[in-house]
């Protein structure tokens, strides 16, 4: 969890069009297991 937050501080809080950016989406899902 802490490692995840270090890499993606906003992980789990992505919303709207920002979440649709493929790199952000895939990084969030791969690193944190969070679905955008």
From Swiss-Prot:
The alphabetized UniProt keywords are:
Cytolysis, Disulfide bond, Hemolysis, Ion channel impairing toxin, Nematocyst, Neurotoxin, Potassium channel impairing toxin, Secreted, Toxin, Voltage-gated potassium channel impairing toxin
Annotated ShKT domain residues: 4-36
Recorded protein name is U-metritoxin-Msn1a
Question: What processes in GO biological process is this protein linked to?
Answer: killing of cells of another organism
GO CC annotation: extracellular region; nematocyst
Kindly indicate whether the keyword Ribonucleoprotein belongs to this entry: no
Native species? Metridium senile
Concerning InterPro entries, the annotation shows: ShKT_dom
The role this protein plays is: Has hemolytic activity. Inhibits voltage-gated potassium channels (Kv1/KCNA).
Q: Which domain of life is it from?
A: Eukaryota
What coarse category fits the chief subcellular location reported for this protein?
secreted
């Amino acid at each position: 969890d802490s490692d995840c937050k270090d890499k993606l501080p906003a992980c789990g809080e992505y919303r709207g069009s920002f979440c649709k950016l493929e790199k952000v989406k895939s990084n969030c899902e791969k690193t944190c297991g969070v679905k955008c």
